[in-house]
Amino acid sequence: MNPLKKLASQTAVYGLSSVVGRLLNYLLVPLYTRYFLPAEYGVVTELYAYVAFLVVLLTYGMETAFFRFSKKEESTKVYSTTLISLLISSVVFVGLIFLNSSAISEWLGYSNHPEYIQFFALIIGMDAVSSISFAKLREQDKAMRFAFIRVLNIIVNVGFNLYFIVYQEYGIAYIFIANLFASVITLIMLFPEMLSSSWVFDKKLWKKMMIYALPLLIAGLAGMTNETIDRILLKHLLPNTDIAASELGLYGAFYKLSIIMILFIQTFRFAAEPFFFAQEKEGNGRKIYADVMKYFTIIMVIIFLGVTIFYDAIKGFLGSEYHDDRGFLVVSILLLANLFLGIYYNLSIWYKLTEKTKYGAYLSIFGAIITLSLNFTLIPLLGFVGCAWATLICYFSMTVASYYIGKRHFSVPYQVKRIALYLFVTLCIYFCIYFTNLNMWINSLFLLGFVIFVYRLEKPKLSLKL
């Protein structure tokens, strides 16, 4: 089967689960923004930002290590060793958090709600254990089972949210309880994979995996700094503390409006990581990586234009308390930032294939330094608009750095000029939209024109590939 077709088919299956799941999850945004004030939603936004850090910490790069070592060692032994490692670390983590939940909740400013911390400890622990079984499904190309469990998780989460918030009219604590129920059911659904494990812990293999994975952990933590630190710092750095929680809630809601691009990136990564490793030994592997990058970028810029053109319709998903004039600019900046993040993920294959994962850590730390310095500088001046600019500058800088460093270690013939052309045309269209007050449907002609433009340039290659 044509490698690009295989990647496309796998992405479609993973994408179906992510699209259906995320769209169902997306329904929670209008729910939350209609039942909770921005200050209340700010609590949800902040706590989930911390969760993102802790999930990375608790999986410590073992998913990617599992993919790498499954190609070199006996897959059953690799899975068993990884599963036992994650089980032990997760149990220890949950126990420590429960013992210190009161102190942690007081430190975060939620001293009356230590149960929030306990709920999240259980969620994070179960999700960390589940992650390796999901990785096993991906490694075995069991995309349908992967998709089914992912969608079930979201359906359960959304269902309990609707029951607790709409029917029972409970408070925000029940958002976390709904998530906890979903995590429990997901773990139960993955029991067949876990029970099929040989339950053998290979200490020598584990050490090798940890050496490979630890730089990825550092990269992951630095990456989470880039993705979520703005929502952690925002309420602490705003000069007007009276509106800090409300501003955080607004920013969290606007961040959700960029979900379509984040969704595609996540979907692509589920399929692409095992695909890239599988193509490593192929003679034309590097050419395939270059083609994937180009077509990935095309899809990303189309998503960018689609969301910005139809923003007025999309913002209707938010409650009236969340309609703010800063929304369009912030969402546009975040979309562009995520576009560069997606390109960076494509580029990052060079240090994974060459086992120079320390460079992933270096690049992420480089990005984290930019993110932290810009957030501390821009938030007091621009509020959450400064958060968005910091994210864009960070991801753009990481992309450029990864490209030039990667050229020296693992040269891939990326079509840089063609990709740059598409980005330039996209930005020209965006500025036409931003600085004019044309009707949304008239603006959509720009999108149609861009698609035709791309098709005319790529048609010979598409015909050849397909």
Tell what function each PLM region has.
Residues 1-3, 7, 172-173, 188-227, ...:
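Interhelical loop/hinge segments that connect adjacent transmembrane helices in multipass membrane
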Residues 10-25, 153, 175-186, 190, ...:
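Transmembrane helical elements of multi-pass membrane transporters/channels
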Residues 40-58, 231, 247-265, 294-298, ...:
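Alpha-helical transmembrane segments of polytopic membrane transporters and translocases
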Residues 69-85, 250-364:
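Specific pore-lining/lateral-gate transmembrane helices of multi-pass inner-membrane transport
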Residues 2-63, 87-100, 123, 154-158, ...:
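Signature of the first transmembrane helix
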